[in-house]
């Protein structure tokens, strides 16, 4: 017997029992995006490797250790996308939709990072991202956060996520802060672990994000980034806080929040939860006003966020188990006897025309009525439609409510209205 081929570690299959909930959650997210006037953009999974090195930063963990990179047959270096923002910016520049224009875009799909698989973190994972171009005020930052808060209310998880905010200022402000932080870290080199020593000169702000508890205590005495903010960034951040407060969105200022990608400036934010064990990020984003120019376009303000769908699904399942997708089908069409198969197919198509949202499954593969009713139960059908030779000859259908066993024989023309009533 041939050896079974398994899925790659950290790259998961999602079976129909799971995808129904995914679809309901995704549809809820998309409905809100549409209501705010955001439009979908579809992007390639594979991009040229230099795109991510320039956008994300050469000395980030993502570029140094986590990207799936390979050479194609022409010798070009390609990478499976580890995140969506860089590709979205590349597409906007390439197709000329950013310069002197306002764009509100969203995308959803798989991303790839070579990480150690664990609960809610996988090597192939799914993100929904949202990007806004051409608006530089704190009001659009606030709208993005308000939109995410609306999602949490719809999904029933609002009490289980908390908003953390910070401003990392302008490039000049960060350069001044970087000097002060490096000077502080140099005074305490003997207390730093190997990872922080490596980051101290290449990407010192990432030291603030360390998970080492001893270094976290040390950092309590480190310089604070907010003390180095330029006046414009400070005013931007203060106005954002006022807008959120007036909108009833509570938040905490986290001075260590810097995000793991180099392209951010000014506003950064994360929605975090402790309901999945250790604190985890559900949604994160911020401003990246320099990226469009950095990738070859005209200077364009930009802000956005990304949300990991695996972690979101886990959170909904954990804290709001009543948020379920409809399982099974609405109706199961049973037929037996000479001439009933084509009659069943024709009836099914008419019902789908009349009720476009109807989930109707037709029995194929034969079987007596008992076996077909068993299949209807297996698929979770709420109603059975029965066609025998007598019903076909009379132009009728038996409609049986499978929850209480009640049934009626109706003319075929009346079946759609009865189904609509039963399934309402």
Curated annotation (Swiss-Prot):
Belongs to the class-II aminoacyl-tRNA synthetase family. It is found in: Cytoplasm. This is Histidine--tRNA ligase. InterPro entries: aa-tRNA-synth_II, aa-tRNA-synth_II/BPL/LPL, Anticodon-bd, Anticodon-bd_dom_sf, His-tRNA-ligase, HisRS-like_core, HisRS/HisZ, HisRS_anticodon. GO terms for cellular component: cytoplasm. The gene is hisS. Keywords: Aminoacyl-tRNA synthetase, ATP-binding, Cytoplasm, Ligase, Nucleotide-binding, Protein biosynthesis. The keyword ATP-binding applies. It catalyses: tRNA(His) + L-histidine + ATP = L-histidyl-tRNA(His) + AMP + diphosphate + H(+). One of its GO terms (biological process) is histidyl-tRNA aminoacylation. Its EC number is 6.1.1.21.
């Amino acid at each position: 017997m041939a050896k079974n081929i398994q899925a790659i570690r950290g790259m998961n299959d999602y079976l129909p029992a799971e995808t129904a909930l995914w679809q309901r959650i995704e549809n809820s997210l998309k409905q809100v995006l549409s209501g705010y006037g955001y439009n979908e953009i579809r992007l390639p999974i594979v991009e040229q490797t230099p795109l991510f090195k320039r956008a994300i930063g050469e000395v980030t963990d993502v570029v140094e250790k986590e990207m799936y990179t390979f050479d194609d047959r022409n010798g070009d270096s390609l990478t499976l996308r580890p995140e969506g923002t860089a590709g979205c910016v590349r597409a906007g520049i390439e197709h000329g939709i950013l310069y002197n224009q306002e764009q509100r875009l969203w995308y959803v799909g798989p991303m790839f990072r070579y990480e150690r698989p664990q609960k809610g973190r996988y090597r192939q994972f799914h993100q929904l991202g949202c990007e806004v171009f051409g608006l530089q005020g704190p009001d659009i930052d606030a709208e993005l956060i308000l939109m995410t808060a609306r999602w949490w209310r719809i999904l029933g998880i609002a009490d289980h996520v908390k908003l953390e905010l910070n401003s990392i200022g302008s490039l000049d402000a960060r350069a001044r802060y970087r000097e002060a932080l490096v000077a502080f870290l140099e005074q305490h080199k003997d207390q730093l672990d190997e990872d922080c020593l490596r980051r101290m000169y290449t990407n010192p702000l990432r030291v603030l994000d360390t998970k080492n508890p001893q270094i976290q205590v040390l950092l309590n005495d480190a310089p604070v980034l907010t003390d180095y903010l330029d006046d414009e960034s400070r005013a931007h951040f203060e106005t954002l806080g006022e807008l959120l407060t007036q909108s009833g969105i509570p938040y905490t200022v986290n001075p260590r929040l810097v995000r793991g990608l180099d392209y951010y400036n000014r506003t950064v934010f994360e929605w975090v939860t402790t309901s999945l064990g250790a604190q985890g990020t559900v949604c994160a984003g911020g401003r990246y006003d320099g990226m469009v120019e950095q990738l070859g376009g005209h200077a364009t303000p930009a802000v956005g966020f990304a949300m990991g769908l695996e972690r979101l699904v886990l959170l909904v399942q954990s804290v709001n188990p009543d948020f379920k997708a409809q399982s099974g089908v609405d109706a199961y069409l049973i037929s037996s006897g000479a001439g009933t198969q084509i009659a069943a197919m024709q009836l099914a198509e008419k019902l789908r025309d009349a009720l476009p949202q109807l989930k109707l499954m037709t029995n194929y593969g034969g079987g007596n009525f008992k076996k077909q009713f068993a299949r209807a139960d297996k698929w979770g059908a709420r109603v059975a439609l029965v066609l025998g030779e007598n019903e076909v000859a009379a132009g009728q259908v038996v409609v049986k409510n499978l929850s209480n066993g009640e049934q009626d024989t109706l003319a075929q023309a009346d079946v759609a209205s009865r189904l609509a009533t039963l399934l309402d």
